[in-house]
UniProtKB/Swiss-Prot annotation:
Function, as annotated: May act as a negative regulator of osteoclast differentiation.
Name of the molecule in the record: Transmembrane protein 178A
A GO term from the CC aspect: endoplasmic reticulum membrane
A Pfam family hit: Claudin_2
This protein's record includes keyword Translocase: no
Cytoplasmic compartment segments: 208-215, 289-304
Gene Ontology biological process: negative regulation of osteoclast differentiation; regulation of cytosolic calcium ion concentration
Keyword Glycoprotein: yes
Ranges in the topological domain labelled Extracellular: 26-186, 237-267
Primary site of residence: endoplasmic reticulum
Length: 304
């Protein structure tokens, strides 16, 4: 009985630590990061930091979350400076993609407004203190530091002067990314809920039907591990899918931009490891203890 209580205490401790790590991962925004410092240094060293290129960096395209009323968007020129209150829409860039390429705005990676970012499940933010250009835009109120990640699909946009196949591909990519994001968030939420139930059941096992409740808690912990695995794999798939979206001159990243997973995702993986360990401990111990009891009974009967 003492060993069973010790196993329950260890598994409960592991599950609580796992729950804390999982909640930390869910509510922090450092799942994925991009670092454009080397990219900017490379562009500067190649002499691409001329006034035109600098102007392009100070006139962010649709990727930047702008403040203000979207009704003012259409009255602004696509390549005009973005004033406080101006909002750029994705279709503005896409409708004029040929002219943009002709003007050379997107032909060169150094002409693109790329800034260091970090993102989580709920929002994407720019890293302050690295690039003075984005710092200036945020301080002036032209751009927001963080923007919410979409979990709903807006009405299909009508794109002019753009091939139908490209328009359809962009919309299909939006659908696929939306589903992947929903799967990631949904399964992670279910994992947190099931893990909380498992912790409660494990705590109850100290006072009532220790063998049964311990086994049920172990099954709940293993179910949490399955949900976490699905969620984390889906998140990795969504990141890879987004990096390979078409057209590359809008959605892709230059080779010299460093990008990768960050500490929030590490917390989620650590949570997965702890909860699987707790689940295996809770589910395996009753069978091991039962085998030992049967072996002792058999040895005693043999002696008699």
């Amino acid at each position: 009985m003492e060993s069973r209580g010790l196993v329950t205490a260890v598994s409960l401790t592991l599950s609580i630590c796992s729950l804390l790590l999982l909640v930390t991962a869910i509510f922090t925004d450092h799942w994925y990061e991009t670092d454009t410092r080397k990219h900017k240094e490379m562009c500067d060293s190649q002499g691409n930091s001329d006034p035109t290129e600098q102007k392009n960096r100070l006139m962010p395209l649709y990727q930047l979350p702008f403040r203000g009323d979207p009704s003012n968007t259409r009255r602004l020129g696509l390549l005009s400076p973005a004033p406080a209150g101006g909002v750029r829409e994705p279709e503005d860039l896409l409708e004029n993609w040929r002219s943009l390429l002709g003007l050379g705005v997107l032909e060169s990676d150094c002409g693109r407004p790329l800034f260091s970012t970090y993102s989580g499940l709920w929002r994407k933010c720019y890293i302050m203190g690295i690039d003075k250009d984005i710092d200036s835009l945020i301080i002036k109120g032209i751009a927001q530091k963080c923007t919410a990640i979409k979990y709903h699909f807006s009405h299909p946009i009508r794109l002019r002067n753009i091939p139908f196949n490209l328009t359809r591909a962009i919309q299909q990519d939006e659908w696929h990314l939306l589903h992947l994001r929903r799967i990631t968030a949904g399964f992670l939420g279910m994992a947190a809920a099931v893990l909380l139930c498992g912790c409660i059941v494990a705590a109850i096992s100290f006072f009532w039907e220790e063998s049964l409740t311990q086994h049920v808690a172990g099954l709940l912990f293993l179910m949490t591990g399955i949900f976490c695995t699905i969620s984390l794999c889906t998140y990795a798939a969504s990141v890879a899918y987004e990096l390979n979206r078409q057209p590359k001159f809008i959605y892709g990243l230059p080779s010299d931009v460093e990008h990768g997973y960050s500490w929030s995702l590490f917390c989620a993986w650590c949570s997965l490891g702890l909860i699987v360990a707790a689940g295996c401990l809770c589910t395996a111990y009753p069978f091991i203890s039962r085998t030992k009891i049967l072996h002792l009974k058999f040895a005693r009967d043999s002696c008699v």
